[in-house]
């Protein structure tokens, strides 16, 4: 499903924007905005639901406890009263459905930006090498990888599959050649004959596991050396993987630290992601009663995620998408938190805000201890 959405929805939109402005960086920005605008009603529903639940949750929990205590011996009446509470305030799970609906599209967008033309496309083949006397009893089962759209020109791409006709089980001393071809069986080498400078799309071959078990040549021929497990990986270079955008040196560049150098463009993108995530969380609590636990989580979460992405191998193009998406999310959150609440929730919110301000006001009016709640009793 992810691949279908990517090939039939997202890549055509990407082609359209690249045709308007020949910049893959701008195409990523435009694609991100279009998808986020299209998903606005769904994400807005989730934000509204989360905002309302944050206000109503203390009241819901209090009423649920009272109902369970009052009707402890009458489960039918208990369920009936609990249902009334859910009907009045809504289900806490109501905000999850819009998120689930939009997840396939967001995953497809993420997968699109991790593939061609923005990054090198890997094909992974897991092999099992058996002794010669055992391989004869194995029935060959053809292997076909997942299809990936490979851009061979700015707006021209073909679906490419890696296959082994006799499967991934080899006998010691056997050889097999990995075929790269389109869905209709046309060889990838044949496709490249119509491309300028076809050598830039030449796949690179490597052994990521079991380099003592198999050997692989530059044409994709695998030779089994000894019994064991091995993994061979082919990578087809991405057309735009080395293209830059603004301060980004290469959209396909991966990693904050590589080859002994710091990639400052990646560092800036990761920092921008953390900052926009923090801003979005800060805006989600705007106009709400103070919640120390939530405030702490809002500070720690962006730092943890930002630190993780510094060392998580994401291409610069994906990080650019994440920053733009976070900016859109922050703007959307700001607009939605300014919406009027239902009357019953507004009353609850007013009471919560009053309860927080009354103790401080009363203490100050009485001329007593004017310390703030978090200050030690020993004085300032």
Curated annotation (Swiss-Prot):
Compartments (UniProt record): Cell inner membrane
Keyword Glycoprotein: no
Gene Ontology biological process: protein insertion into membrane; protein transport
Main location: membrane
UniProt key word 4Fe-4S: no
CC terms in the record's Gene Ontology section: plasma membrane
Pfam families in UniProt: 60KD_IMP
GO molecular function, one term: membrane insertase activity
Keyword terms: Cell inner membrane, Cell membrane, Chaperone, Membrane, Protein transport, Transmembrane, Transmembrane helix, Transport
Topology class, membrane: Multi-pass membrane protein
Transmembrane portions of the chain: 9-29, 93-113, 266-286, 304-324
Entries under InterPro entries matching the protein: YidC/ALB3/OXA1/COX18, YidC/Oxa/ALB_C, YidC_ALB_C
Family: Belongs to the OXA1/ALB3/YidC family. Type 1 subfamily.
Summary of subunit composition and partner proteins: Interacts with the Sec translocase complex via SecD. Specifically interacts with transmembrane segments of nascent integral membrane proteins during membrane integration.
Function as written in the Swiss-Prot or TrEMBL entry: Required for the insertion and/or proper folding and/or complex formation of integral membrane proteins into the membrane. Involved in integration of membrane proteins that insert both dependently and independently of the Sec translocase complex, as well as at least some lipoproteins. Aids folding of multispanning membrane proteins.
Protein name per its UniProtKB record: Membrane protein insertase YidC
UniProt source species: Parasynechococcus marenigrum (strain WH8102)
